[in-house]
Design a protein with these regions (language model features):
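Intrinsically disordered, low-complexity, charged/polar segments
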Residues: 53-74
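Acidic, low-complexity, intrinsically disordered interaction modules
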Residues: 21-54, 58
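Generic low-polarity alpha-helical segments
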Residues: 1, 7, 24-27, 38, ...
Length: 74
């Protein structure tokens, strides 16, 4: 894969939040104070493999919002 490709994360409404490079790290912040780092691989403009699971990026944001997990570049 091209290392210059970016993964553009959005909020649950589809508004762009930030981008990370392909194979970059995402930090997940849980309500109990725990943090988890996930490796992200770009699949296409709207899909990524996050911690080994394929997601549509808008669906990932909705799932994180539902589970009260915030996320940011690591």
């Amino acid at each position: 894969m091209n290392g210059s490709q970016q993964i553009c994360f959005t909020d649950s409404a589809g508004k762009a939040l930030f981008s990370i490079p392909d194979s970059g790290l995402l930090c997940l912040f849980y309500g109990n104070g725990d943090r988890h780092f996930a490796v992200c691989h770009r699949l296409d403009d709207t899909h990524a493999e996050i911690d080994g699971v394929n997601y549509s990026l808008p669906d990932f944001a909705k799932r994180m919002k539902h589970n009260q997990i915030s996320f940011a570049p690591a």
